[in-house]
Swiss-Prot record:
Coiled-coil region list: none
NCBIfam families reported in the protein's UniProt record: PRK04296.1-4, PRK04296.1-5
Origin organism lineage: Bacteria, Bacillati, Bacillota, Bacilli, Lactobacillales
Record-annotated active site: 94
Residues engaged in binding Zn(2+): 151, 154, 188, 191
Chief location: cytoplasm
Subcellular location field: Cytoplasm
Family, similarity comment: Belongs to the thymidine kinase family.
Keywords annotated in UniProt: ATP-binding, Cytoplasm, DNA synthesis, Kinase, Metal-binding, Nucleotide-binding, Transferase, Zinc
Record-given protein name: Thymidine kinase
Gene source species: Lactobacillus johnsonii (strain CNCM I-12250 / La1 / NCC 533)
Residues at which ATP binds: 9-16, 93-96
GO biological process per UniProt: DNA biosynthetic process; thymidine metabolic process
TM region(s), chain numbering: none
GO molecular function ontology, one term from the record: zinc ion binding
Length: 199
């Protein structure tokens, strides 16, 4: 039975490497996947899923106006007609940047096309507000799973993302600022509020 999955975690929790692993596993069994990512994240180029350990792969960029249901329906139809087989799974990286309509389209892919959708992304931003995509995935997903990582400062479980500028914490600004290890640290709640204190 197809389901909508949301796997979330703080920065550096292995979300992108996990999605690349899932894609590989499906394809190793001869099954077709649709690999997609938000066009907002351009750190490695628009339409690229890239992990911090260096693995990367091209993906379909999701723009604000892309209808995911129609895209997957057409992809599925053309693949079946050409003999390439049906799409077995839709994989979406950087899902926090999805709009509400994208998440509803993902649910429609699951419910009407019977294709599982696995979305990976951050849950909360650097101010601990939910991203639009994450909020709607938490509402509409059949299964939600946390991907764990450790606090940059103490090694406890990290649940938050601390924005950094020149080594100093930043608590105000635009919600979206694309960056990696140089801009964000995964942190526990204590070190989110007290980054310079020992726990």
């Amino acid at each position: 039975m197809a389901q909508l999955f949301f796997r979330y975690g703080a920065m550096s929790s292995g979300k992108s490497i996990e999605i690349l692993k899932v894609a590989h596993n499906y394809e190793a069994q001869g099954r077709k996947i649709a690999l997609m990512t938000s066009n907002v994240d351009d750190r490695s180029g628009v339409g690229t899923v890239a992990s911090r350990i260096g693995l990367h792969r091209k993906a379909v960029p999701i723009s604000e106006d892309l209808d995911l249901f129609n895209y997957v329906s057409e992809l599925n139809k053309s693949d079946v007609e050409s003999g390439n087989g049906r799409v077995a799974c839709v994989l979406i990286d950087e899902a926090q940047f999805l709009k509400r309509h994208h998440v509803l389209e993902c649910a429609k892919i699951v419910d009407e096309l019977k294709i599982p959708v696995m979305a990976f992304g951050l849950k909360n931003d650097f101010q601990n507000h939910l991203f639009e995509g994450s909020e709607n995935l938490l509402i509409f997903a059949d299964k939600v799973e946390e991907m764990k990582t450790i606090c940059h400062y103490c090694g406890h479980k990290a649940t938050m993302n601390l924005r950094i500028n020149s080594g100093k914490p930043v608590y105000e600004g635009e919600q979206v600022q694309i960056g990696g290890d140089e801009s964000y640290y995964p942190v526990c709640r204590f070190h989110y509020f007290h980054p310079n204190k020992q726990r």
